[in-house]
Structure formats: structure tokens, C-alpha cells
């Protein structure tokens, strides 16, 4: 679970892997947790279920943007436009390159 950062996607290179991640996030959300401590977050991120929703929304947007993008630069641009305040740009850079087949992982 991430909080207001670009989500690390280099380890989930296949759509099926990201779908499994989304399913796990759905299970977590269904528990209606009062407190959620993201494993990676910007300072000041709320420690509640909004971090689950953020991670889920990010992964869905990444999936759609990756399908449309012709290369990592296009994917990075789309995600930065969607999440202009998100930190950890290196995560997006590596994840986009790996998922577009431009960097071995």
C-alpha cells in the first residue's frame, strides 16, 4: 500500500499480477480498516483506508496508461499528469521502463 507516491510496478510486469494485487486491495478494503499504515508514503499521508483506495486507483490508471503508451516516456508523462504531486518519481521511471520492455528486471 502506497500513500501519495508513485507506486512501484517493476515487480508486477504482467497485467495478471497487477489484477491479483487489485484483488488483494479489494479484500483489504472490505475489512473496513480504521488504520492503514502504507509501506511507502509521503509525510503527512492519512493513515486510513484512503491509502488502499489511492493504491488501487493508481494501479488501474497505470494499467490503462500502459496499454495506450507507445513507450515509457509516454507512460511516465501520463502518470505524472494524473498524479502531479506524487513523490518517488524514480519508482515511476523504473516501473514504466520495465513494463514497456525497455529495461530488464
Regions found by a protein language model. Give the residues of each.
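Second-shell loop/turn segments in exported
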Residues: 8-13, 62-66
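Active-site metal-binding loops of divalent metal-dependent hydrolases
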Residues: 1, 7, 39-42
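An active-site-proximal "capping" alpha-helix that borders the catalytic cofactor pocket
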Residues: 12-39
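Accessory terminal helices/loops
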Residues: 29-35, 42-105
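Acidic/histidine-rich, surface-exposed loop or edge segments in extracytoplasmic proteins
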Residues: 3-8, 57-60
